[in-house]
Each structure stands twice: as structure tokens, then as C-alpha cells.
Amino acid sequence: RGLGDVYKRQVYNNIEIILVGSKEIIEKTAKENNISIAGIGIEDAPDVITMEDEAGDIMKSKNQSSMAVGLKLLASGGADAFLSAGNSGALIMGATMIVKRIKGIKRPAFSPLMPKVEGQVLLIDSGANVECRPEMLQQFGIMGSVYMDKICGIKNPRVALANVGTEDHKGGELQHKAFALLKEAPINFIGNIEARDIPHDAADVIVADGFTGNIIVKMYEGVASALMLKIKELFMKNFKTKLAAALVLKDMKELKAYMDYNNYGAAPIMGVAKPVLKTHGSAKADTFILSLIHIS
């Protein structure tokens, strides 16, 4: 879906797009939907990694999957970036084993941008590493700080550690040790942050272990979806509320766009040697287009 729009963006932004997957299925789907794929490269990859497959399958039984072939293409210089909506565990495994980590980085991490009252906040890690060591969290803070500075243009970004309280002594052993290491790091570490403060303009980078980070990002998405449904329900109550809805329709569309994670593109995998980005398995065509624009 959306290949036609992707192609328009390719021409506009001078991006060369290579679709990696079953050539037969890609061409058949394009033909059935009357979509021109002229000018878009196709790299044949017959295997498929499902969401049920083990992460290690990308290096073993599924080494001819679109994910494996695409990452090899990136590693060999045949591509400049790789974008996937596939199995998260397999993508992390493949990025680590095929593309390789940046020298000195212990573990790569998912790092999505999320909306806040003013601008966006980067969350790192949002699920790549369920169990973390303190030094990993320190590296996450450094990588997140560099990204927000160099890529997002936020000078001296504020880095905070996700915790159960703002006091220095809060949290378990991991948080205590990570707090001390983050204080020593060459970044603007502002201390602990509670989840309720993340949507406000309290920090620019949120550091978390993958378990905590994944809960934060999924809760973010769930609350946004539930809130929009509730607002719609309230506006549809009666004639007066429907009239009120008509008066603020433009504003509501802006709010919906602000709350929709599809409008924030893909999450880069920090810590690998070349750009690898992950988007939702349920991502819409617009999400891919936005991600391509970010890559360019």
C-alpha cells in the first residue's frame, strides 16, 4: 500500500528505493493494484520471518528473508539505510550480527521519538534489551544526547532516567548504579523522571531499560488512542456537542495528528554502524513515507 506515493516521494527527494522481498509477490501486488514501480529496485528475498519466529532464525533458517538480505545489502554498501516493520528481535539480532555495532557500544537500542507538550522527546531503549546493565544505560544516555543534538538540532539536550520517583535514591540497584554513571557522563543529565512527567517539557531524552521503555511507549500509544475515542464519543452525544465539534474540527484534526504515533516515523536503532530503522508492524503507508523523508 502506498507504493505510488512512495515513488512520488522518491522522485521529489532524490531517494533511490530498493524493495527487499519476494520479487514475484511484489510485482503481482503492484499489478493487481495498478501501481507503477518503474524506477524502484527490487532485491529478491524468498524467505519470510514471521512475528512468531525466533530472533536467531535470521542468521540460520531464514537467512534469505527480506530482513537478512536487506541488512546484508546495507552492510556491503549496496544501500545507505534499512527500514523494516518486521520482527523486532530478529531485526536487532540481524543489525548486531550483520551490520555490526559501533566500536565500544555494548548493545544497540530502539529509540523512538514521542510527542510532548513542546516538541518531541526521545526514549531509549524502548524494547531491544529487556535486561540491562548500568553501563548500557549510560551509553544509551550518551547516544540519545548526541542524536538529539546532531539530528534534531536541540543543543545541550536534557537527559533523564526513567524511575519511580525524582529523588536521587529512588529505584532499584540498576537505577542507582545507572544514575551515578549518567552523572559522570559528558551530557546534560538532569536526574530521575517519573512517567507522568514525560509528556510535559521536562526532558529531551528519556533513558530506560528495554522492559520499562517498552511499557512507557505502549502506554503512550494506548492512552492517545483511548483519549481520541473518548473525545469523539463526547462530541457525538447530541446536536449541541456535534455543533461544537464542527466549530473545532480543524483543531481536533491537529490534535489527532499530534497524538498519532504514525506521524512520528520510524525509530532508529542506536549503536549500530549504519542507519537501521524500525517502524510498527501495523504502520501505515504515510509512516513509511515520513520515515523515508527522515532518512533523506
What do the predicted segments below correspond to?
Residues Q10-N13, K31-A38, C152-G153, L182-I187:
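Short helix-capping segments at alpha-helix termini
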Residues N14-E16, I151-V159, F189-R196, K237-A246, ...:
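Flexible, glycine/charged-enriched surface loops at secondary-structure junctions
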Residues I18, E24, E131-A195:
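Glycine-rich phosphate/diphosphate-binding loop of Rossmann-like nucleotide-binding domains
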Residues N87-M136:
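Glycine/threonine-rich beta-strand-loop-alpha-helix active-site module
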Residues V99-R107, K116-L123, A202-I206, G210-L292, ...:
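Glycine-rich phosphate/nucleotide-binding loop
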